[in-house]
């Protein structure tokens, strides 16, 4: 029986954040911060090389979610996003688009919510799913869906 096609779903925010904190500050010749961008792109390319997916997509958060409306202090203890990380999140979105991968964001939902929906739909369509994230919230999806933590060596 032939292997089922694979879809790789990447939690863009989680992987960028992990790279930002794991890799020492790097800058381009023009002074643009690049450590998170470098880490994200390295992880993405390695995952694509290792798994040869038939499909792939990257999800990003785009602001407040329905959870903020339900609970005013949702993520209230988190510090504001550093400017050098904000710049790199935008750069990563550009890189993903240039690589020809779909960027998926849904107003009022976090990236991991979007990935969970895409994962369940993909399984229902007969695909094997690999979610690339450092967010342990996705562990509740484990079944035929595989979770790939980018800090593990590839």
Segment roles from a protein language model:
Residues 145-154:
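Single conserved hydrophobic/aromatic residue that forms the stacking wall/gate
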């Amino acid at each position: 029986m032939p292997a089922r096609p694979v879809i790789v779903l990447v939690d863009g925010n989680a992987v960028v954040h992990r790279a930002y904190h794991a890799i020492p500050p790097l800058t381009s010749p023009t002074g643009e911060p690049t450590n998170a961008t470098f880490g994200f792109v390295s992880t993405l390319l390695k995952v694509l090389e290792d798994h040869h997916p038939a499909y792939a997509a990257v999800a990003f958060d785009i602001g407040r979610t329905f959870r903020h409306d339900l609970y005013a202090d949702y993520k209230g203890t988190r510090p504001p996003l550093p400017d050098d990380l904000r710049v790199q999140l935008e750069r990563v979105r550009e890189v993903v688009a240039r690589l020809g991968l779909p960027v998926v964001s849904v107003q009022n939902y976090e990236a991991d919510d979007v990935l969970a929906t895409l994962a369940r739909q993909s399984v229902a369509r007969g695909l094997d799913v690999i979610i690339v994230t450092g967010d342990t919230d996705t562990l509740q999806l484990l079944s035929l869906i595989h979770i790939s933590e980018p800090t593990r060596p590839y």
